[in-house]
Amino acid sequence: MAALLLLLPIVFLRTLPDAFEFPKMELLATGAVLILAIGAIRESARIGASSETAWLTALPHRLIAWVRSDLLGAGVVAYLGSALVSTVFSIRPALSLFGAPESLAGLKTAMATASIFFASRSLSSNQRWFHVMTSVASVAAAIAAGYALLQLYKLDPYTWAGYSTFGGENRIFGTLAHPNMLGAYLVMSLPLTVRVATRATSRLVKVAWVVVGAATLLVLITTLSRGAWIGLGVAGAAYVLLVSRGARATSSSSERRARAPAAGLVWPAVLAVLTIVLLLISAPQLRSALVERIGQIGNMSAPTTQSRLQLWNAGLRMGADHPILGAGLDCYGDAFPAYRSAEYVRIEWGGNPTKAHNEMINILATQGSLGVVAALAVVLLVARAVWRSTASGNPEIRGDAVASGAALAGFAGQALTGFTVVAIGALAAALAGWLGGAQDAETSRPDPVRSAGAPSGRSWIAGLIVFAGAAALFVSSVVNPWRAARMEYEASRYPMGSPFRTEAYARAAALLPWYDRYEREAGRSLFIEAVQSRDPDEAWRALERARQAFENAVRMDRRSGVLRAYLALVLSSEVRLRPTREGPARVREVAIDAVARDPLNPYVIGLAEQSLMGAELDAEAGSLALRCAKLYPGFAQPFADVGSMALRQGRSGDAIDTLAIAVRKDWHGDPQGKAKAWESLSTAYLRLEKYEEAQAAAESALRLNPALPTASENRLEAIRLRAGRD
């Protein structure tokens, strides 16, 4: 357990597509399998000590007694039950079971996190457990913060893509993939670090922990995470409240009531002052960004605030449409396209979120009212455990409960605008598990397993069954996803269209037949392979395989507009290569269906336009392009498509007018699309004998993509014709 809590926040592996969250998830799942196996072995020992009949007869009584003595544990089981039911009735049950990509919050994660809760609950009878747990969590926070400081001072030995930025500065993320997640973990760790410092007996150790706490607070502030700052404020308020609560509950004199809270607040005050001094000295480049970010906390018009509001609105509407069980555990991202707004697209441009960025709204959307009730029950029972433990007659338990309560309050505060990831959830579960035992520490007694003497034949059989079950669970939940992720990483090292890339994705898809991304990426690579092929027969075979891959992906995710848009593009290419009478009708059907399923996604609309254009269905393509241009007037692609259709129809003047607009608009990171627009514009100019403009347009295309053959030909032709005219 201690090793898990130490490693989960700091583990990352650069040889995986998801270098941070995926290895943490696999580590947590491995630990959970071991914990479940140990629990199963203990139960098999019970069976061996008596008999199967006696064990089954006693089981109902034991369960009733357990529920009465451990309401918090029963609440956690009830929440797991809600997650299980939402998984069974999910819009995508397999995804809910294993977790969505870039989210990893399925039933597998829920059960693994619950195992941490129950393991910590069982260890709470050991007086050293809280000290061990908080010490390793504080060490992990120090390591994560230390790596973040390297990033802050631009000393990171690794180069990372996809930085979150603000005010022109890269935001630090440490070992937790995103500044918000780093900030959330540090918020939880700070009260624990304060507690470790106050319990230290050596002055040198105490000072060392104070420095660690100050550095942690410094990093927390420089994450520029408003959610983490809110969590810090909530944690601070909870700390003051709980210290005061403990003093009132245990003091008999007014003098002691006055002193106790003040004593408890000395170290946090020292940390705060030291951090402010360090921040002013060491990070002057962040001062303006800090001021601006703080001003955005209450600014409802800030883009990120508007983005959150859009996500919350979508989550509430999702919950209203699936009021009892939700759309399915971890299916927010899959259900989101039906609730996407044009305003959200303008803010985030084409992103498909996997979370609602508010824990309760996310639960409502994915688990319905049943999940919300179960989650609220757990929250209230944890609060009850904190409140009872801070009034304990044991001063050690009281102080530990104050730190735990403040950490969990910080967790709840950041969850108002964020979400839970593996490291944060595991620490919260461990603290809640300890509280579940601490509130009854003075009365609870261990429930020993009676020894049965030498292992019996039945015990050996039970042990073998447990081992086989644990091995099967480990292979299906850890080994296969890990192998598939490694294959995906190897695939990503090859260019799009490479047979090696395609085959690696195909092998990954065979390992995880419920995961549509592998089929999608195999299909995309096959499509590019077909486009690049000069042999019509080879191109046709690649297109057939691409179509099959996208059809497989659509069967896995029947709601996806993106997958259908790619399928329409492949069908359109097949129509061009080997025309059939029914081909264009099939392209039209799939393209229109794709847009109907994700009607405000500009990329889906764009892919549908291109597929319709490829099948020479210009009327339908033009209608979609005009619709996209009205929704997103700054987006270049629909203007380029309208211009390309005009060029193909021989309306060169109209093509020039529209393409000239397109090349000046926003391509949203698509330089190849812009290059093609310049190339088409050069063709239109040539047709109208505007050779100087044609040469300039062709050269603009070649600056973006020197390999465009038509642009090269247009440039040479324009130069030749200009020379002939002169």
Q: Where are these predicted regions, by residue range?
A:
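TM-adjacent membrane-interface loops and short helices in multi-pass inner/ER membrane proteins
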Residues: 178, 309-353, 360, 367-374
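Short, hydrophobic transmembrane alpha-helix segments
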Residues: 11-25, 45
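Transmembrane alpha-helix boundary signature
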Residues: 39-66, 84-99, 123-128, 156, ...
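Membrane-interfacial, low-structure loops and terminal tails that flank and connect transmembrane helices
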Residues: 46-70, 246-262, 389-398, 442-458
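Flexible juxtamembrane loops connecting transmembrane helices in multi-pass membrane enzymes
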Residues: 167, 171-173, 235-236, 255-257, ...
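C-terminal luminal/periplasmic domains and tails of membrane-associated envelope-modifying transferases
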Residues: 489-726
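Alpha-helical transmembrane segments of multi-pass inner-membrane proteins
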Residues: 1-12, 28-42, 75-90, 105-285, ...
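Hydrophobic alpha-helical transmembrane segments in integral membrane proteins
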Residues: 281-298, 455-500, 517-521
